[in-house]
């Protein structure tokens, strides 16, 4: 064998070894198993410290999807709440942001939610230059185009969303995990993705990970954000290991009151349906892996978790079991909806739009309409509780009809739904500009401002 041939073979061998090494280094992290589901531990609402700015009021923020547009819009809402003072039911003056007990977020809104939960007030000094005014989309494209990343991207198990997760750690989250989030004193942060196989909402909380028999505390926040914003086709799914069935998890005891009823009360029926959808995640034998995509596919305004919690609260109140939410006198929900609906020129031409435009519009229209229905459903629940409480108060002890008594068994809390959206600016010169902003991970600085 000639020296030239030997030299060429060495180079080929070196390249092969380098490629294999790169693939090995790029193996996605695995969410570790737990041997026993412990209902009193981990990152969940029940373990969060009390937010005592006003114990009678529960303030919930729901941050919608929409790329950097959504991240900036939700950040602006936090700035407003930080600068707004209120007088609590105890007579104390405080910042409205300190009364927030829960923040939900999907897709672009998940970044603001997670970052605020991690950093608290420090976010207001750093978020703009670390994320909002950064060309995150451009940086992702550059990384994907770098040859050293190609072997990893071709490995089949380490996709574009894992590449994105690495970037999110570098610029925003600093490898923080949900254990770090649990140690914070802020509100409960609930971000969600969508299970690709079933279309079900997947929430990043220990209750969900109990079903998977896995420890959420060791999952990085960047992976949750990457999963919540993994736009199908554009970004790859984020894969979670399913250890379900190995830690003794069982559905909550309250479900036994309704599972075997042929005619459960309506809120209970919806809550049971949600619980059965969650139970499907617990079969780690036939579903050892879960592939997660953008949370906006199943819930683009971050409201499904809130609605489920209210319906469970109503169902438990019906059977006389109190809940933390049910003890509040007022529940205030800010729906921070960055949905935009820019006009299209299609109706001014006899030529129909192309295949790509049709595909994008077909995917977006059902999501937008479902988002509208979620907000209206919240208002319906608010109205039903108010009316039923009024009827019960007026009937008092004279209500003898058991059906009326049953129908009026709703929590005494008042629900206030506040829609924070671009639609409120219609007629304002800024509306057209904001409504035309793209759903991407880059925005001009003036749009953020």
List PLM regions with ranges.
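Catalytic domains of lipid- and phosphate-ester/thioester hydrolases
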Residues: 4-9, 24-449
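Bacterial N-terminal signal peptides
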Residues: 12-23
């Amino acid at each position: 064998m000639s020296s030239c041939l030997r030299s060429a073979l060495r180079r080929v061998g070196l390249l092969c070894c380098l490629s294999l090494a790169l693939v090995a280094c790029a193996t996605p992290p695995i969410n570790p198993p737990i041997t026993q589901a412990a209902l009193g531990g981990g990152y969940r609402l029940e373990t969060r410290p009390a937010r005592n700015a006003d114990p009678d009021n529960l303030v919930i923020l729901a941050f919608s999807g929409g790329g950097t547009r959504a991240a900036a819009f939700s950040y602006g809402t936090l700035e407003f709440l930080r600068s707004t003072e209120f007088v609590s039911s105890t007579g104390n003056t405080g910042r409205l942001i300190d009364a927030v007990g829960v923040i939900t977020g999907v897709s672009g809104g998940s970044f603001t939610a997670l970052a605020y939960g991690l950093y608290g007030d420090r976010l207001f000094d750093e978020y703009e230059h670390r994320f909002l005014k950064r060309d995150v989309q451009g940086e992702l494209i550059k990384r994907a185009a770098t040859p050293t990343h190609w072997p990893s991207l071709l490995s089949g198990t380490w996709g574009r969303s894992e590449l994105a997760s690495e970037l999110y750690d570098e610029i925003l989250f600093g490898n923080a995990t949900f254990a770090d989030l649990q140690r914070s004193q802020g509100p409960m942060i609930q971000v969600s993705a969508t299970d690709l196989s079933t279309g079900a909402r997947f929430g990043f909380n220990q209750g969900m990970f109990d079903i998977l028999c896995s420890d959420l505390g060791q999952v990085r926040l960047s992976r949750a954000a990457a999963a919540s914003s993994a736009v199908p086709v554009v970004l790859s799914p984020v894969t979670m290991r399913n250890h379900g069935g190995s830690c003794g998890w069982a559905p909550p005891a309250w479900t036994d009151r309704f599972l075997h009823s042929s005619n459960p009360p309506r809120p209970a029926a919806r809550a049971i349906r949600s619980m059965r959808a969650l139970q499907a995640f617990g079969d780690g034998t036939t579903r050892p892996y879960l592939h997660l995509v953008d949370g906006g596919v199943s819930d683009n305004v971050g409201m499904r978790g809130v609605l489920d919690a209210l319906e469970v609260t109503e169902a438990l109140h019906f059977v006389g079991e109190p809940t933390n939410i049910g003890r509040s006198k007022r529940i205030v929900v800010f729906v921070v909806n960055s949905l935009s609906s820019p006009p299209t020129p299609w109706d001014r031409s006899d030529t129909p739009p192309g295949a790509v435009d049709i595909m994008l519009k077909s995917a977006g229209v059902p999501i937008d309409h479902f988002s509208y229905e979620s907000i209206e459903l919240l208002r319906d629940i608010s109205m039903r509780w108010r009316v039923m409480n009024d009827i019960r108060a007026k009937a008092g002890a004279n209500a003898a009809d058991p059906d009326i008594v049953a129908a009026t068994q709703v929590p005494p809390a008042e629900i206030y739904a506040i829609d924070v959206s671009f639609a409120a600016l219609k007629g304002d010169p800024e509306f057209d500009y904001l409504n035309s902003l793209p759903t991407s991970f880059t925005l001009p600085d003036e749009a953020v401002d």
